[in-house]
Amino acid sequence: MADVTHQEPQGDVTDASTFDTEQLGFMCGIEVHQQLATGKLHSRQPSELFDVTIDSVPEDWPRYARKLRLASGEGGKVDVAARFEKRRNRSFVYIQSPNSGLIELDESPPLSHDSDALDVALTVSAMLGAKPVGAVQTMRKTVVDGSNTSGFQRTSLISTDGTLKTDTGDVGIDVLCLEEDSARKLDTIPTDQGEQVIYNLDRLGVPLIEIATSPDIQTPEHAKETAMALGRTLRDTRRVRRGLGSIRQDLNVSVACGDRVEIKGCQDLGWIPRIVRLEMVRQVHMYRLANELRSSLGLPQLPPNRDRDDIGIESEVAEAVAKHIPLEYTDVTSAFASLSLIHISEPTRPY
């Protein structure tokens, strides 16, 4: 393939069909998260979801109030997201459903992996030709929004280096993991001490298979084809959950003149090509706007391939921009204090 990413991106941002994905240096990968129809991953509780809302939760279900504390990691540094969450000063209430116990409440150590969930993960690995790891070790991802009582999500790498066959072309499978799903948010209540978020623990700990592809997707339509092929592979095991919310696709999209952007929660497969195209166009549009602003200040232009950014030049640009846009904070609370909020019911125009 010829290197065309040295050229300026060609196309009209008002019409995504005018762009050539190859000329843009288009790259795309998909992450799929699929709930399994097994027991919970690190407790022997059933993965049953209860059809309740904040108004219909049975009164005899216990409730527990918690507040996450800021702490440094093993490297001695405090996570940026955790620091931001502390400033929000939120508290959390967890409703204990019949299928949640001490492990879900973070009052007891987790058990080993559910054997059925591990078997499904290895089955999918074999279907994708992925290579299982020598030993399964559980990692912890920081979660600070309160959706996990422990403050982190447990994830285990199961296999790597697989291949998904599609009509358009093969797509590499980088990793296949087993991880815990989060608790379900039921409501957010404003209080004098900050927001109080209410969670239902029925979904916490439900096993998820996470499959991350290589950036081998060639076109927006191929992204949809890949998502459909992954979903078909998972359903062929006959051991995954079905229905709304049981599977989620995250899209990673980039073009040469932009940056990698992760778009989370693409539920409707039919929307994937449109979402990918809009993200391609958005990145090109932001690139052009950035160069237009740089031209107005007499600053060097961004290269059409961001891999060729010059650190020295970008540092000088940052210093010049800081002189024109000083980072000063102004309290505008009084200007908006007398305003009232209204609900806009008129539908907005679609893109």
Task: Describe each region flagged by the PLM.
Residues 2-341, 345, 349:
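Basic, nucleic-acid-interacting segments
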